[in-house]
Amino acid sequence: MNDFPWLTIIVGFPISAGSLMLFLPHKGNKVNKWYTICICILELLITTYAFCYNFKMDDPLIQMSEDYKWINFFDFYWRLGIDGLSIGTILLTGFITTLAALAAFPVTRDSRFFHFLMLAMYSGQIGSFSSRDLLLFFIMWELELIPVYLLLSMWGGKKRLYSATKFILYTAGSSIFLLIGVLGISLYGSNEPTLNLELLANQSYPVTLEILFYIGFLIAFAVKSPIIPLHTWLPDTHGEAHYSTCMLLAGILLKMGAYGLVRINMELLPHAHSMFSPWLMVVGTIQIIYAASTSPGQRNLKKRIAYSSVSHMGFIIIGIGSITDPGLNGAILQIISHGFIGAALFFLAGTSYDRIRLIYLDEMGGTAISIPKIFTMFTILSMASLALPGMSGFVAELIVFFGIITSQKYFLISKILIIFVMAIGMILTPIYLLSMSRQMFYGYKLINVKNLSFFDSGPRELFLSISILLPIIGIGIYPDFVLSLASDKVESILSNYFYG
């Protein structure tokens, strides 16, 4: 047990401070915006301080654990803790949410409620990553969906209600499978039902039952990740949402699905995961090719970036399915890497729209001269997305490739085939990313229009772009900073498998 409830404070502070904002007298939009940014910065500083002084990187066990009896009747505990798997995602959540709050400055309609929803989402996401109790994990998982739905339905494009409804139908529907899995896995094979993840990790199940549990959790996490064919909510949602919301979706929400796959499917159900891992590899490979092939056909700029997210998530699925030390480490690194890259691309797409008021690529062209700073940052981050050496994505994808090669589970011909198809996907990636830049910034469509000029990136946008670019380059140059956080936990998870 931890002496000081750091994690409880970290989870509860954003939503508590956000609730306070709703009840205080309205002092104007500017006050609400700066209040939210200050809360996010303070939360990030508290989190960083707590982890620096309490987290030991060479310890694969749960650290900073907190265990409080909550509801006696259900034997329900408020049980929090972190390890190498969750620390990176929690810090990523804090960083991206802070930048998203800064990106939300143009929001003026109901800005107080908008910023409250961002802070409520912040608490739900950190709660999901730090939960050590299955029912608490489910509650935090659902808590995070409510503000996302409201952010999607109240702020965005003309079809925002349609996209928000589609999002909630997919995610709430998949949550039924998550709840059934949580209740089933906690009630099975014990005189005293337990929801403690540490105890459940040592539990064994009949093969058929373990497979059923695995499929239930897989459906829930496949929607959030997303894994094809359960991905169709994502392009519509990104296409209509405000770009600060898109930053939170691409940077954090998608990573919750991948985190759940490792935390529950892989750690609690190793035998079933071993059986399903070849199918994950196949689906991940198809996903890379499918999304990379579909993306060039998207006229909507944000939808094209959304399909690139689906493609990049394929590498994470393959890394999880490889059941190797490099593969799983590469998947975790890709979770962090794409969190930064995806959020950055959506921010730049949104800030471009604020200036030219166009979202369809075939209507753009010739803006590079008018907005050179946005053009430069968009080009650099497009290079990061296509895994240019020196950027975080390159290292992550390279380690995933190495994980496939070193896997002892698969035959040589299977590994060659998977790598070959993945390589085709990597060839297609520059095609849709570079054509996107060409359609946006090159040509003569807008440059020849008389009396038409655009303001380039201001200090706020430039600061935000550079802030998100620095960790992408930093991880690309020194990936061990992220890998060292999770390496011992990865070894601990893989110790339950016969190969790795």
UniProtKB/Swiss-Prot annotation:
HAMAP family this protein is in? Answer: NDH1_NuoM
* Transmembrane regions listed in the UniProt entry: 4-24, 35-55, 87-107, 113-130, 134-154, 167-187, 211-231, 242-262, 272-292, 305-325, 330-350, 386-406, 416-436, 462-482
Q: Does the keyword Transmembrane apply?
A: yes
Membrane topology term reads:
Multi-pass membrane protein
| EC code | 7.1.1.-
Native source organism of the sequence:
Arabis hirsuta (Hairy rock-cress)
> What keywords tag this UniProt record?
Chloroplast, Membrane, NAD, NADP, Plastid, Plastoquinone, Quinone, Thylakoid, Translocase, Transmembrane, Transmembrane helix
Report any Pfam family annotated for this entry. Proton_antipo_M
Q: Name one GO molecular function term.
A: NADH dehydrogenase (ubiquinone) activity
- Any single GO BP term: electron transport coupled proton transport
Subcellular localization: Plastid, Chloroplast thylakoid membrane
Q: What is this protein called?
A: NAD(P)H-quinone oxidoreductase chain 4, chloroplastic
Which Gene Ontology cellular component annotation is one that this UniProt entry carries? Answer: chloroplast thylakoid membrane
**Where does this protein chiefly localize?**
plastid
Q: Which reaction does it catalyse?
A: a plastoquinone + NADH + (n+1) H(+)(in) = a plastoquinol + NAD(+) + n H(+)(out); a plastoquinone + NADPH + (n+1) H(+)(in) = a plastoquinol + NADP(+) + n H(+)(out)
Q: What class of enzyme is it?
A: translocase
Q: Identify its protein family.
A: Belongs to the complex I subunit 4 family.
Reply yes or no: does the keyword NAD apply. Answer: yes
